């Protein structure tokens, strides 16, 4: 395989599975390739490089990767110079890279979560030497700054502030595949945000597996609340969001920063996972139902108009009907504006995988459907309250469902679709909400 053969068509295609951190990793892979003269395509048929950036939080994500990898066999047959690369969390699992190469020997490059910055080097080796490259680092290295990044949006951007997780929830594989917590220096974060603002970006979402742990291990004396206040001082920036927060670490200082900093949006993603104190203990979440509800009350009392969103796992080992009803009642009490609901998925090498009393699939699905129905009913009622109100929306671009409309979000994260000129993209506009829908709002520009 030669460089010349592969350069006839310098197109690449990236498929991203999983969370926002994976999305930002893919933006970096795209940035590295574009800096080498490649262009992105969504059509695998015309790509000379295909990358799968994988997730392993749930079995379903892994099955999708295996299915899509199988479909690439014919493409590789048609074009032997096609380079197929697999990376991300799924590859970081013990034995997974070898399993992939055994089942799909036509894969050219495999790497994990700690060495994505080396992708150009791996690609060069494949193109120049015709070798197969597999490199999974078992230990996280230092944070690599300054990688080129190809952002999906021109209006809003993800900025990672820390990597890894130290919490070891019993159901979760993230600490095993993303490593221990490491924080970026605040000066590097501020520099990245200032560069984004200079390019016209208006909104930043700060990312981390647990943003509330930010600052641990750094030489400088700073915590997450301190970082939020620093980011709030960046001139020209309009809005700041963050995710994900662990309830046990969401401090009063962070709540007050959201309240007092004008650029911080009134939206908190606060994963509860279960409304049962017994199950929360089994999950190793380090808080109980009462602690969580007290935290919610504190947030609501300090931050008017705050919206709360969450993650919930249904069917954790040993979950009884009573435990499930505790979750339902907690959702009713909190009144979430949206919730990411998941059926528990067994993950190898996690404590929950070895637990007895795994819940049968039919019970899991029944509880899941009941939960989704209850949450959606509440969301519809909450969205109805916006009808007739005037809200400030940052215009993000054309609506996904109707390209004749524009779309954007309120400060507290509500999605609003409306008719307007494309010149408004990137602008803050006032919209009157004329109709509420289950998952979005319809607005009209206020002249």
Curated annotation (Swiss-Prot):
Binds 2 [4Fe-4S] clusters. One cluster is coordinated with 3 cysteines and an exchangeable S-adenosyl-L-methionine. It catalyses: N(6)-dimethylallyladenosine(37) in tRNA + (sulfur carrier)-SH + AH2 + 2 S-adenosyl-L-methionine = 2-methylsulfanyl-N(6)-dimethylallyladenosine(37) in tRNA + (sulfur carrier)-H + 5'-deoxyadenosine + L-methionine + A + S-adenosyl-L-homocysteine + 2 H(+). SUPFAM superfamilies: Radical SAM enzymes (SSF102114). [4Fe-4S] cluster 1 binds at residues 19, 55, 89. It is found in: Cytoplasm. Residues 10-128 form the MTTase N-terminal domain. Its EC number is 2.8.4.3. GO terms for molecular function: 4 iron, 4 sulfur cluster binding; metal ion binding; N6-isopentenyladenosine methylthiotransferase activity. One of its GO terms (cellular component) is cytosol. It holds the Pfam family UPF0004. It comes from the Bacteria. InterPro entries: Elp3/MiaA/NifB-like_rSAM (IPR006638), Methylthiotransferase (IPR005839), Methylthiotransferase_CS (IPR020612), Methylthiotransferase_N (IPR013848), Methylthiotransferase_N_sf (IPR038135), MiaB_methiolase (IPR006463), rSAM (IPR007197), rSAM_horseshoe (IPR023404). SMART domains: Elp3. Keywords: 4Fe-4S, Cytoplasm, Iron, Iron-sulfur, Metal-binding, S-adenosyl-L-methionine, Transferase, tRNA processing. Its cofactor is [4Fe-4S] cluster. [4Fe-4S] cluster 2 binds at residues 165, 169, 172. Residues 151-382 form the Radical SAM core domain. Monomer. HAMAP family: tRNA_metthiotr_MiaB. Belongs to the methylthiotransferase family. MiaB subfamily. PANTHER family: CDK5 REGULATORY SUBUNIT-ASSOCIATED PROTEIN 1 (PTHR43020), MITOCHONDRIAL TRNA METHYLTHIOTRANSFERASE CDK5RAP1 (PTHR43020:SF2). Catalyzes the methylthiolation of N6-(dimethylallyl)adenosine (i(6)A), leading to the formation of 2-methylthio-N6-(dimethylallyl)adenosine (ms(2)i(6)A) at position 37 in tRNAs that read codons beginning with uridine. This is tRNA-2-methylthio-N(6)-dimethylallyladenosine synthase. It comes from Clostridium perfringens (strain SM101 / Type A).
């Amino acid at each position: 395989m030669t460089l010349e053969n592969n350069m006839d068509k310098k197109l690449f295609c990236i498929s991203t599975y999983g969370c926002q951190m994976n999305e930002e990793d893919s933006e970096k892979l795209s940035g590295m390739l574009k800096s080498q003269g490649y262009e992105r395509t969504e059509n695998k048929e015309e790509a000379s490089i295909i990358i799968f950036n994988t997730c392993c939080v749930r079995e379903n994500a892994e099955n999708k990767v295996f299915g899509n990898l199988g479909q690439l066999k014919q493409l590789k047959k048609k074009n032997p110079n096609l380079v197929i690369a697999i990376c991300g969390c799924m590859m970081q699992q013990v034995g997974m890279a070898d399993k992939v190469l055994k089942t799909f020997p036509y894969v050219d490059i495999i790497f994990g979560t700690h060495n994505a910055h080396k992708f150009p080097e791996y690609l060069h080796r494949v193109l120049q030497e015709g070798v197969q490259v597999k490199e999974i680092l078992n230990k996280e290295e230092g944070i690599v700054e300054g990688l080129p990044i190809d952002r999906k949006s021109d209006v809003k951007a993800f900025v990672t502030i820390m990597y890894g997780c130290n919490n070891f929830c019993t159901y979760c594989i993230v600490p095993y595949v993303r490593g221990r917590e490491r924080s970026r220096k605040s000066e590097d974060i501020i520099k990245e945000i200032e560069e984004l603002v200079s390019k016209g970006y208006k909104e930043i979402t700060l990312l981390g597996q647990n943003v509330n742990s930010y600052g641990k291990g750094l030489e400088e004396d700073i915590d997450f609340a301190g970082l939020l206040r620093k980011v709030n001082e960046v001139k020209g920036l309009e809005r700041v969001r963050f995710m994900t927060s662990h309830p046990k670490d969401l401090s009063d200082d962070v709540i007050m920063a959201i309240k007092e900093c004008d650029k911080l949006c009134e939206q908190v993603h606060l994963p509860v996972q279960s409304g049962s104190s017994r199950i929360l203990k089994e999950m190793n979440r380090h808080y109980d139902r009462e602690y969580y509800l007290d935290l919610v009350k504190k947030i609501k009392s300090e931050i008017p108009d705050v919206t709360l969103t969450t993650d919930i796992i249904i069917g954790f080992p040993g979950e009884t009907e009573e435990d499930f009803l505790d979750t339902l009642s907690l959702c009713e009490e909190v009144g979430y504006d949206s919730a990411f609901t998941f059926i528990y998925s067994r993950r190898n090498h996690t404590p929950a995988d070895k637990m007895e009393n795994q819940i049968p699939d039919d019970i899991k699905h029944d509880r899941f459907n009941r939960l989704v129905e209850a949450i959606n009913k509440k969301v519809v009622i909450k969205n109805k309250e916006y009808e007739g109100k005037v809200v400030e929306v940052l215009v993000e671009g054309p609506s996904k469902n109707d390209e004749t409309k524009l779309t954007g979000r309120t400060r507290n994260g509500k999605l609003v679709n409306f008719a307007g000129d494309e010149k408004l993209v990137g602008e803050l506009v006032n919209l009157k909400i004329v109709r509420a829908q289950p998952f979005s709002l319809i607005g009209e520009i206020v002249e």
